[in-house]
Every structure is written in structure tokens, then in C-alpha cells.
Amino acid sequence: MAVPRANTSKARTRRRRGVNMRLQAPNLVECSGCGNLIMPHHVCPKCGFYKGKQVINPDKLD
């Protein structure tokens, strides 16, 4: 039966595991009202549009 010659170092183990734990950039879409980049399924904070309809008044947010 095969046996490793030496213990795997912490750095080597973490480097191998770290490849699968990379952070992904957030998925952004253009707002239909103003063209601002927003996260999908969220109201645009700049113009207050969601799915082509204005749902909030951004002037009242300030």
C-alpha cells in the first residue's frame, strides 16, 4: 500500500483547497430606468425602478 513520504505542509494543503474558495464578482445588470448597474432582483437606488415600474421615490430616501 502506498504511503506518503512526508506530511503535507499547511501551506500546500491550504493552497490546494484555496483554489475552490475564490471569491466571485457579483452579477450586475443594467437598470431599465436609468442604465445604472444594479444587482438582479433589486430596486435601483438611483431611480427607484424595479421590473420597468417605479416602486419607490428615490428623493424620499435622502
UniProtKB/Swiss-Prot annotation:
Domain of life: Bacteria
Record keyword Transferase present: no
Naturally occurring in which organism (per UniProt): Treponema denticola (strain ATCC 35405 / DSM 14222 / CIP 103919 / JCM 8153 / KCTC 15104)
Gene Ontology molecular-function annotations: structural constituent of ribosome
GO cellular component, one term: large ribosomal subunit
Biological-process GO terms, alphabetical: translation
Keyword entries, A-Z: Ribonucleoprotein, Ribosomal protein
NCBIfam families, alphabetized: rpmF_bact
Protein's name in the database: Large ribosomal subunit protein bL32
Family classification: Belongs to the bacterial ribosomal protein bL32 family.
